[in-house]
């Protein structure tokens, strides 16, 4: 498998970044839901710290993914589909990128406005990006939670669209992003 994208499929780096971000976002949800059930104490604070660290990792990977997309150029040839579906696919991908960036940024803002640092697995702390402010913290907390609901919805629609292409249209859309899978040989 090649690192770079080609007309036949996505390269190893694009696939790795895609699936790493997917797995980390799912882990984020599981960690924070579990943390909310814990009483205040070291376990809860450790879970929240891990949630923040993974969020910043997602932000970094998303920035690398976008940079790779811009630098790499070549991407798989588009699958023939009606214009409205092409527009919906492009809009959906753009929205996913936006949400994947906005989610950790609003989390970082939420943490900063609460006066809490955002660390990275205990190795270092990111700078505060906003002054401590209770009202701003409440606002960013609501935005962060609302954005996750939108992200989850768009991600499910994205997955359903890929499954539709695979099982109904029987095209290469899903196969070209699956790890360790290449296009069908014809």
Where are these regions (language model features)?
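Membrane-embedded alpha-helical bundles that constitute the cytochrome b-like, heme-associated redox core
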Residues: 1-186
């Amino acid at each position: 498998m090649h690192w770079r994208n080609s007309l036949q499929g996505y390269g190893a780096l694009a696939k790795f970044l895609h699936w790493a971000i997917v797995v980390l976002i799912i882990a984020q949800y599981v960690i924070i839901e579990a943390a909310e059930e814990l009483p205040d104490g070291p376990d809860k604070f450790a879970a929240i710290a891990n949630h923040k660290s993974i969020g910043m990792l997602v932000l970094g990977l998303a920035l690398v993914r976008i940079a790779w997309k811009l630098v790499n150029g070549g991407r798989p040839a588009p699958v023939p589909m009606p214009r409205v579906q092409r527009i919906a696919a492009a809009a959906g991908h753009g929205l996913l990128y936006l949400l994947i960036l906005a989610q950790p940024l609003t989390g970082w803002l939420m943490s900063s406005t609460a006066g809490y640092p955002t660390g990275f697995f205990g190795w270092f702390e990111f700078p505060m990006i906003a002054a401590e402010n209770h009202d701003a913290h409440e606002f960013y907390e609501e935005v962060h939670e609302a954005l996750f609901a939108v992200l989850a919805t768009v991600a499910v629609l994205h997955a359903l669209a890929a499954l539709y292409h695979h099982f109904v249209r029987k095209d290469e859309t899903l196969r070209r992003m699956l790890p360790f899978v290449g296009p069908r040989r014809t």
